């Protein structure tokens, strides 16, 4: 294994692309848009992660319906997009308190920093997609998998059954990726596309 090689990960129907414009990408022309070689400017970076998605701005009725426990603690969530952060989004979509339960399984330094990250940010880099060199990938996996193994002991697998929680460990890894790569690497955000018609 060459330590200077870039290794990339994508996901089903989600691809790295060279241009931000996505509306004309389809199954016939996708090869014209795919990132197939490292860009020259990547030499200045340790990692490539997806351009972020924003989780703030949910409809008020959805916040009331799915985030009512959060609203009891802080009613201003309804009126302030800054308070509509990653933690609220996770609580609404993947079970109230589940992200905090997982954060408690991190080492103390990362516990505090990751809690701060999900509480202060309303964007994250999605899909557990990244491109990096082997040394960075090894460090990432050494940080991620022991944490997820500890989380497996805290979550009852029988309770993780539907869309909200069935892929709990992937949802946790997805949020942690943004934090970890931004904290531990010099990163660049690249374009990506989700194509549902393949």
Regions found by a protein language model. Give the residues of each.
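ER/Golgi luminal nucleotide-sugar-dependent glycosyltransferases, focusing on the catalytic module
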Residues: 1-198
